[in-house]
C-alpha cells in the first residue's frame, strides 16, 4: 500500500493502522453520485422507473440510509436484510423482497411492513403468499420470476 493511496480523502495506510486489516471501505460521495446518476439517466416522463440497490452487494444501516436519501429502492433477500432496511428508515413501498426459500415468517413480515414488491419464485410460494395476505387482510404486489427451462450452452469457464 503506497503512502499516498486514498479513498474519499482518507489514507488507506491510516485506516489499516487504525482498524486493522482486512477492511472494507466505501466512498460515500461516490456511492451517492452513482445513485443520483442512475436516477437521472433512467428518468423519463413517460416511464415509471425505480433504481433499486441490491442489498446483497453490501448492506448496513448507513448504506440503506444512503440509498433511501438518494430516492432509490432497496432489494433485500432475507428477513434480516428487511429488518435492517426498515430500521434504517427505508420506506417499505421502496423495498423489493427477493430471495429463494422465503419463510412464512419472512413473507408475513414483508406483508405487515407493506413492502412494495415481493418477487416469487414458484407456484407454491405464490399460494403461500396469497394465503398469508388473505389471513392478514392485506394486498401484495408481486413479480413472478419464470425460468422457461431453456438451456444456454456456454463454454466451461
Model-predicted regions and their roles:
Residues 132, 148-157:
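Active-site loop/helix belt of alpha/beta enzymes
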Residues 1-141:
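A charged N-terminal "starter" segment
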Residues 139-151:
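Glycine-rich, aromatic-flanked loop segments that form ligand/cofactor-binding clefts
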Amino acid at each position: 500500500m503506497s503512502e499516498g493511496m486514498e479513498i474519499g480523502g482518507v489514507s488507506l495506510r491510516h485506516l489499516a493502522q487504525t482498524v486493522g486489516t482486512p477492511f472494507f471501505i466505501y466512498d460515500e460521495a461516490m456511492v451517492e453520485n452513482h445513485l443520483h446518476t442512475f436516477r437521472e439517466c433512467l428518468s423519463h416522463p413517460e416511464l415509471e422507473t425505480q433504481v433499486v440497490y441490491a442489498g446483497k452487494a453490501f448492506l448496513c444501516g448507513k448504506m440503506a440510509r444512503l440509498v433511501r436519501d438518494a430516492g432509490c429502492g432497496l432489494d433485500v433477500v432475507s428477513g434480516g436484510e428487511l429488518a435492517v432496511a426498515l430500521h434504517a428508515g427505508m420506506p417499505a413501498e421502496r423495498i423489493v423482497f427477493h430471495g429463494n426459500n422465503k419463510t412464512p415468517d419472512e413473507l408475513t413480515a414483508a406483508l405487515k411492513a407493506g413492502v412494495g414488491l415481493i418477487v416469487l419464485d414458484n407456484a407454491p410460494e405464490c399460494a403461500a403468499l396469497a394465503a398469508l395476505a388473505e389471513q392478514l387482510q392485506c394486498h401484495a404486489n408481486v413479480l413472478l420470476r419464470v425460468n422457461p427451462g431453456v438451456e444456454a450452452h456456454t463454454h466451461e469457464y
